[in-house]
């Protein structure tokens, strides 16, 4: 096992910044030592959004964005090192997810595209970098997502208690950790993504703090029913999705043809959509005793309250209560996946992704011991 100190870097679909964590990893033991949040420049965020939503682009624009994100991720790692005083030579490796700009897990040429040049990260930090985690799973017929359930299984499973772990980022994904059963996991649908886009459009706020705006509105049942009729929600697992599907254009199509709905009621209804689509999947799997929630959505008080109401037999709690920061869960997972790759251990779960077999994940971008610069 390649035990040591690892750095995980995550920039998710919410585009609310770059999360960086430092952790000591030794087998099943993952001890978080520090975290750092690096801002996402507004222009870069807008460029990513444009690409994610299928706007016309060029190879030059894709290449530039790949380079810019690689530099941003490298600078984020340097920010963590500066904050902690840890030297680069004390880090075994960086695990970097990259920035997803397109995820197309079905069809003859299934693929997932994460930008953020790992060569630049390695060069800027002088630390071996592991990245491009999703495409190996897809090469074996998998969805390439979600990958975090393997980490959830390693750290949060229980021998007798029925647990599920829910990450609410831009997209919500669920890991089912049920005793005696293979781990299952999939994207339930929108997490914060539509809520964030809507409040930005109408309130110029990046997110609905504590769910406060949504609390002032009412659920519009015709809109909720229209959205719930989307075929994605009835697809069987394995399944995964992203901003290329659930985006502002999708929401506009749902609103078209309905009587006018006030902006605040749309926000309330989007919150209810996230809660209902999550809880329906929990119930379809036979329920659980604890639903452990992480990600930015865990801070949305209305969303948490609605899930508790929809799951009366389940304790809805935070992963923080079990020793894992909900804000840092995904970055920690990719530090752990880098550890798995360098240790020669598989990182995917075929029962989750639908791949034909377990496999090593990612590419390794090594550096010379003394820097080579």
Swiss-Prot record:
<dbReference type="Pfam" id="PF03702">
    <property type="entry name" value="AnmK"/>
</dbReference>
<feature type="binding site">
    <location>
        <begin position="12"/>
        <end position="19"/>
    </location>
    <ligand>
        <name>ATP</name>
    </ligand>
</feature>
<comment type="pathway">
    <text>Amino-sugar metabolism; 1,6-anhydro-N-acetylmuramate degradation.</text>
</comment>
<dbReference type="GO" id="GO:0006040">
    <property type="term" value="P:amino sugar metabolic process"/>
</dbReference>
<keyword id="KW-0119">Carbohydrate metabolism</keyword>
<keyword id="KW-0067">ATP-binding</keyword>
<dbReference type="GO" id="GO:0097175">
    <property type="term" value="P:1,6-anhydro-N-acetyl-beta-muramic acid catabolic process"/>
</dbReference>
<comment type="similarity">
    <text>Belongs to the anhydro-N-acetylmuramic acid kinase family.</text>
</comment>
<dbReference type="InterPro" id="IPR005338">
    <property type="entry name" value="Anhydro_N_Ac-Mur_kinase"/>
</dbReference>
<protein>
    <recommendedName>
        <fullName>Anhydro-N-acetylmuramic acid kinase</fullName>
        <ecNumber>2.7.1.170</ecNumber>
    </recommendedName>
</protein>
<dbReference type="GO" id="GO:0005524">
    <property type="term" value="F:ATP binding"/>
</dbReference>
<comment type="function">
    <text>Catalyzes the specific phosphorylation of 1,6-anhydro-N-acetylmuramic acid (anhMurNAc) with the simultaneous cleavage of the 1,6-anhydro ring, generating MurNAc-6-P. Is required for the utilization of anhMurNAc either imported from the medium or derived from its own cell wall murein, and thus plays a role in cell wall recycling.</text>
</comment>
<keyword id="KW-0808">Transferase</keyword>
<dbReference type="GO" id="GO:0016773">
    <property type="term" value="F:phosphotransferase activity, alcohol group as acceptor"/>
</dbReference>
<comment type="pathway">
    <text>Cell wall biogenesis; peptidoglycan recycling.</text>
</comment>
<keyword id="KW-0547">Nucleotide-binding</keyword>
<dbReference type="InterPro" id="IPR043129">
    <property type="entry name" value="ATPase_NBD"/>
</dbReference>
<dbReference type="GO" id="GO:0009254">
    <property type="term" value="P:peptidoglycan turnover"/>
</dbReference>
<keyword id="KW-0418">Kinase</keyword>
<dbReference type="GO" id="GO:0016301">
    <property type="term" value="F:kinase activity"/>
</dbReference>
């Amino acid at each position: 096992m390649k035990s040591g100190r690892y750095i995980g870097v995550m920039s998710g679909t919410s585009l609310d910044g770059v999360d960086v964590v430092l952790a000591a990893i030794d087998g099943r033991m993952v001890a978080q030592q520090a975290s750092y949040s690096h801002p996402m420049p507004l222009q870069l965020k807008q460029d990513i959004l444009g690409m994610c939503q299928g706007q016309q682009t060029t190879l030059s624009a894709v290449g530039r964005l790949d380079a810019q994100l690689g530099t941003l991720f490298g600078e984020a790692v340097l920010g963590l090192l500066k904050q902690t005083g840890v030297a680069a030579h004390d880090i075994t490796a960086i695990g970097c997810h990259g920035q997803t700009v397109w995820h197309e897990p079905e069809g003859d040429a299934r693929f997932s595209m994460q930008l953020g040049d790992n060569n630049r990260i390695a060069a800027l930090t002088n630390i071996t970098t592991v990245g491009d985690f999703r495409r190996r799973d897809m090469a074996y017929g998998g969805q390439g997502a979600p990958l975090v359930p393997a980490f959830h299984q390693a750290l949060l499973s229980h021998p007798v208690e029925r647990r599920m772990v829910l990450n609410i980022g831009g997209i919500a994904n669920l890991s089912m950790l049920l005793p005696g059963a293979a781990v299952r996991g999939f994207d339930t649908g929108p997490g914060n993504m539509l809520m964030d886009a809507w409040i930005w459009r109408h309130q110029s706020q990046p997110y609905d703090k504590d769910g406060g705006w949504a609390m002032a509105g009412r659920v519009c049942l015709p809109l909720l029913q229209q959205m719930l009729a989307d075929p994605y929600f009835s697809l069987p697992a394995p399944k995964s999705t992203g901003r290329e599907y659930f985006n502002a254009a999708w929401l506009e199509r749902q609103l078209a043809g309905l009587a006018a709905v006030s902006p605040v009621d749309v926000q309330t209804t989007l919150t209810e959509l996230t809660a209902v689509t999550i809880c329906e999947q929990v119930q379809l799997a036979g329920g659980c005793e604890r639903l452990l929630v992480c990600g930015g959505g865990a801070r949305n008080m209305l969303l948490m309250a609605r899930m508790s109401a929809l799951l009366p037999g389940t304790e809805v709690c935070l992963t923080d209560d079990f020793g894992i920061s909900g804000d840092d869960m995904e970055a920690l997972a990719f530090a752990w996946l880098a550890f798995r790759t360098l240790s020669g251990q598989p990182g995917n779960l075929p029962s989750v992704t639908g791949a034909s077999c377990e496999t090593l994940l990612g590419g390794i971008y090594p550096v010379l011991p003394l820097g080579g610069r």
